[in-house]
Amino acid sequence: MEKWASNQEVLGTWLSLPDSHAAEIAARVDFDYVCIDMQHGMADYQVATVMLQAITLTQKGTPICRVPWNEPGIIGRMLDAGAQGIIIPMVNSAEEAVRAVDATKYPPLGQRSHGPTIIGGRARSLGEEYYLSLIHI
């Protein structure tokens, strides 16, 4: 995440296939990020959760997830599952952008609830500065 914060070039990969082994292999290649594509890829919530865990356990690439649409429930679930970055598509107005960002941050900065499912329960321990929100407009 340090490269993102300092505007350095980052190199990553996208995963469309729902496979935790592919996620682990991609993370071990030493990409800066590995993105699970739930919008156009084949991963559902359960598979994406295992893929995020596989990426996280390598302690290499930042685990990112592109959710299917701008919906607070799925955004929160993927963050709870271990995504350190969320790509939010289908954002068509300033109001929708605010709603998307609110779904990624805990109160008082946003509306995200706390319910981590990730290994070690790190969700809140990382701090807001370690999460990335990318909005497709």
Show which residues each predicted segment covers.
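Glycine-enriched alpha-helix->loop->beta-strand junction motifs that scaffold or abut catalytic
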Residues: 29-33, 80-85, 105-106
